[in-house]
Amino acid sequence: MDAQPKILIACNRHVRETYLAEADLEQLATFAEWDWFECEGGGIYDTNDDPETTKALGERLGNYDGLVVCHGCPTLHAGILDQAPRLKFIGELEGDRFASRIDVDAAWQHGICTVDTTNGSSYPVSEWALALIMISLRNAGAHFRRIIGGDLTPSSQDDFGYINGDLTGKR
């Protein structure tokens, strides 16, 4: 491996312009040489199935030590990985836990580590969900007793607090 690893980022233009902040790319440049392979097609859960894009990516991978993939990237199967003898790791920015963009078995057979960052927001999201559950429990006992008592009338849509979501002063 050269003094600095070479990293290829394979994604569509939208990801390049909105997900990858210039400050992050500048930080990456402090310890690695990086380049961008633009590939349009596919989406969050499906990959780019254009054979020309797949061929071009395979031809380009031979000079890289790492690959970061996201929306637009073709599926990284054994045929592509055969063309990447230097490749040591593949990172997935977002998606479905490698289900579509990375053939994990093929990567492991080639000695390539795979890293998935799609769960990077799991803790903040779970904290937010817990907070919403706690908020929804406000007056839960009273509402439950009302329902058990046969009062199935929803809140009046004329109620200012109902329409505007105002919880001030409620207990």
Which sequence ranges carry the predicted segments?
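ADP-ribose/adenylate-binding Rossmann-like module
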Residues: 86-101
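Rossmann-fold NAD(P)-binding glycine/threonine-rich loop
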Residues: 99-112
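A short helix->loop->beta-strand "cap" motif at the edges of active sites that frequently abuts
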Residues: 84-89, 109-112
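Short gly/ser/thr-rich secondary-structure transition/capping motifs
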Residues: 46-52, 70-72, 149-159
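Phosphate-coordination loops involved in phosphoryl transfer and adenosine-cofactor binding
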Residues: 4, 87, 168-171
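Phosphate-binding beta-alpha-beta segment of Rossmann-like dinucleotide-binding domains, i.e.
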Residues: 110-171
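Short, conserved loop/helix-junction motifs that constitute active-site signature segments
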Residues: 28, 80-86
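N-terminal glycine-/charge-rich "phosphate-binding" loop or analogous flexible N-terminal tail
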Residues: 1-65, 70
